[in-house]
């Protein structure tokens, strides 16, 4: 059978369900698909298939995360939706960014209100730079007293405000995913309300191609009579012959001009996000540039050595450490294309970190690297990955 062609008629947005165990995240995911499949805006998938999930790998290909991916459309958009079966999978997914989210659907059972994992997921969403949360108050079919629902809604809004989300204006939809999944029209309508809240509240993401140019350097070689070529995959933006770039990381930042762009040995007018290219750089000696530096649009990113990160420490079964580590631990930090040694400082009152924990830590690198908030990194020791993290704040 021929593969279905993906036709891009509507803007694409990535979302996911977050919230406490048994509050109905997977049932809601199934209901979204089911309700939209009746309108020919999704392919129906059973609850069991979503719960079974698939697996995703993070960019460093070390952390395996159980996650189900479904897709559906609203009137205006195409959504890809991720739902994780286990609490640990949510934490790993949010920290590694393996399944990206532009916004989240926070599912809260109106019978239980805010629970520990509700808080933890909202805090993590804040740490990893998710700015838009739409709330679905679930199981409203089991609550007779509307004042009870007002109370739960108030608690959820307070929680959002506490973690610097817009608790006053975030949409809160009161619904019930199980009867909606079973075809009850009254509750199916709440799924439509949720979709229109997603459409109006989560802004359309800026496409990678529209962001300022950045390419992490993977390899460098010189071409006799032409100069030095840096190769790598363009992370974002566009590069054309004649563009000025900065070479950032490890040493003093240097400026150059791109005099040629090639892909698979063919000359291009321009390279764009996702392309693997070689950039010919004017006036740069091969010795002045190395793997792990980046080429970037001047002024768009700066080198740093000190930052805080939210880190997930791999368990022994995931190939991580067997023992805890302490403040002043000195592993390698794999950032974009290279390892840089750094020193870990744990928060006050935290004596040690066990495999399987997630923790906020301060990291100081021995050499400056092009860094920005929400960037992912891996922690390695002797060539194996022992942690995965995201930059939450740049300090120096």
From Swiss-Prot:
Function: GTP hydrolase that promotes the GTP-dependent binding of aminoacyl-tRNA to the A-site of ribosomes during protein biosynthesis.
Quaternary structure annotation from Swiss-Prot or TrEMBL: Monomer.
Region (G1): 19-26
Name this polypeptide is given: Elongation factor Tu
Gene transcribed to yield this protein: tuf1
Family per similarity comment: Belongs to the TRAFAC class translation factor GTPase superfamily. Classic translation factor GTPase family. EF-Tu/EF-1A subfamily.
Residues that coordinate or bind Mg(2+): 26
Region named G5: 176-178
Catalytic activity: GTP + H2O = GDP + phosphate + H(+)
A cellular-component GO term for this protein: cytosol
Domain named tr-type G: residues: 10-206
Compartments (UniProt record): Cytoplasm
Region (G3): 83-86
């Amino acid at each position: 059978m021929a593969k279905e062609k993906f036709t891009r008629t509507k803007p694409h947005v990535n979302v996911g369900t977050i919230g406490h165990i048994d509050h109905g995240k997977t049932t809601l995911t199934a209901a979204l698909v089911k309700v939209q499949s009746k309108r020919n805006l999704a392919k129906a998938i059973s609850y069991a298939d979503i719960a079974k999930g698939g697996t995703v790998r993070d960019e460093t290909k070390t952390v395996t995360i159980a996650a189900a991916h479904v897709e559906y459309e609203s009137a205006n958009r195409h959504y890809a939706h991720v739902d994780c079966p286990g609490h640990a999978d949510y934490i790993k997914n949010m920290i590694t960014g393996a399944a990206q989210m532009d916004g989240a659907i926070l599912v809260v059972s109106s019978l239980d209100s805010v629970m520990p994992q509700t808080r933890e997921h909202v805090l993590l969403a804040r740490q990893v730079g998710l700015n838009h949360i739409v709330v679905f108050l679930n199981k409203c079919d089991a609550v007779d007293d509307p004042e009870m629902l007002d109370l739960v809604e108030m608690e959820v809004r307070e929680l959002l405000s506490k973690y610097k989300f817009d608790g006053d204006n975030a949409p809160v939809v009161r619904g019930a995913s199980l009867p909606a999944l079973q075809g009850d029209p009254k509750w199916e309508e709440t799924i439509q309300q949720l979709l229109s809240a997603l459409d109006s509240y989560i802004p359309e993401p800026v496409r990678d191609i529209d962001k300022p140019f950045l390419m992490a350097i993977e390899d460098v070689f010189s071409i006799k009579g032409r100069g030095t070529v840096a190769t790598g995959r363009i992370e974002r933006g566009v590069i054309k012959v004649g563009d000025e770039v900065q070479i950032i990381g490890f040493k003093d930042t240097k400026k150059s001009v791109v005099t040629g762009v090639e892909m698979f040995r063919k000359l291009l007018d321009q390279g764009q996000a996702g392309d693997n290219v070689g950039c010919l750089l004017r006036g740069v000696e091969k010795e002045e540039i190395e793997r792990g530096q980046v080429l970037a649009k001047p002024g768009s990113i700066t080198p740093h050595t000190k930052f805080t990160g939210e880190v997930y420490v791999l368990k022994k079964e995931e190939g991580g450490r067997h023992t805890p580590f302490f403040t002043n631990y000195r592993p390698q930090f794999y950032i974009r294309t290279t390892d840089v040694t750094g020193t870990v400082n744990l928060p006050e009152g935290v004596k040690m970190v066990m495999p399987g924990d997630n923790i906020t830590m301060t990291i100081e690198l021995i050499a400056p690297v092009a860094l920005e908030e929400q960037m992912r990194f891996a922690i390695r020791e002797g060539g194996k990955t022992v942690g995965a993290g995201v930059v939450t704040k740049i300090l120096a």
